[in-house]
């Protein structure tokens, strides 16, 4: 009898409200307060297996904390999900994006993200989209306990992925602990592979809106009236056959 991979859905997105037992907003403790990565004007809808969020105009910004300035509106799964010690574990979601008032082809103005995060090591494995781009992020966050942070944006223009505003993309981030590798895919096509990776034992999934303009001269440069609309569905994990 042939084994079948085990697929687990994190949230069926039944609605009508977002399930607060499954999701929480990313928070950063600052000297004067706890910063919640949530756009107060966000229009959120949960129904028919989909989460949709629309922010007509970003408002969140920070003058010196780069991570806080980046994360405009970011939800994290309440529980971590383990990575199987052998075989290939794939974390996946379908995402769609429509940029609102953004500079064409400039992902820094804001993108829809599917995040696969390891907060123990600061490692980030994301698949992201705007109206006109789809790309991978490979990153080590500049957390207090992390050395040598980096951020790489990987655009693979020859993959042949059809890109259009509001189009659904099937995204995957796969880990193979034995091979020490990670792979990012969209619609079954490989965006990027990384090797000699410290594969996490468990990850936190996230969904949200992120900008990537550098903070400089004591102020944020991430706001110029732009916004973003996005959607997520089928957020979950597929474990290897046992």
What is the predicted function of each stretch?
Residues 144-174:
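Short, aromatic/His-centered strand-loop micro-motif at the edge of beta-sheets
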Residues 128-130, 174-178:
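Short beta-strand micro-motifs enriched in acidic
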Residues 13, 167-175, 182-184:
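Short tryptophan-centered beta-strand motifs in secreted/extracellular beta-sheet-rich domains
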Residues 27, 32-146:
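Secretory/extracellular carbohydrate-interaction modules
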Residues 1-38:
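Extracellular carbohydrate-recognition regions
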Residues 3-16, 55-63, 85-106, 144-147, ...:
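Ligand-recognition surfaces built from glycine- and aromatic
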């Amino acid at each position: 009898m042939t084994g079948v991979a085990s697929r687990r859905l994190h949230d069926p997105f039944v609605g009508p409200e977002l399930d607060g037992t499954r999701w929480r907003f990313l928070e950063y403790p600052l000297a004067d307060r706890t910063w919640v990565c949530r756009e107060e004007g966000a229009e959120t809808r949960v129904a028919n297996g989909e989460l949709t969020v629309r922010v007509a105009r970003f408002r969140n910004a920070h003058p010196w904390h780069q991570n806080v300035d980046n994360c405009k509106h970011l939800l994290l799964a309440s529980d971590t999900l383990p990575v199987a010690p052998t075989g290939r574990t794939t974390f996946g979601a379908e995402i769609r994006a429509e940029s609102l008032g953004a500079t064409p082809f400039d992902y820094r103005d804001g993108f829809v993200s599917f995040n696969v995060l390891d907060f123990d090591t600061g490692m980030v494995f994301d698949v992201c989209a705007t109206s006109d781009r789809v790309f991978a992020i490979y990153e080590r966050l500049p957390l207090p306990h992390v050395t040598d942070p980096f951020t790489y944006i990987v655009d693979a223009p020859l993959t042949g992925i059809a890109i259009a505003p509001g189009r659904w993309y099937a995204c995957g981030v796969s880990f193979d602990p034995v091979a020490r590798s990670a792979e990012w895919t969209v619609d079954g096509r490989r965006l990027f592979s990384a090797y000699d990776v410290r594969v996490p034992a468990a990850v936190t999934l996230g969904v949200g809106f992120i900008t990537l303009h550098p903070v400089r001269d004591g102020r944020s440069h991430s706001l110029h009236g732009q916004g973003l609309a996005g959607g997520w569905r089928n957020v979950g994990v597929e474990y290897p056959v046992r």
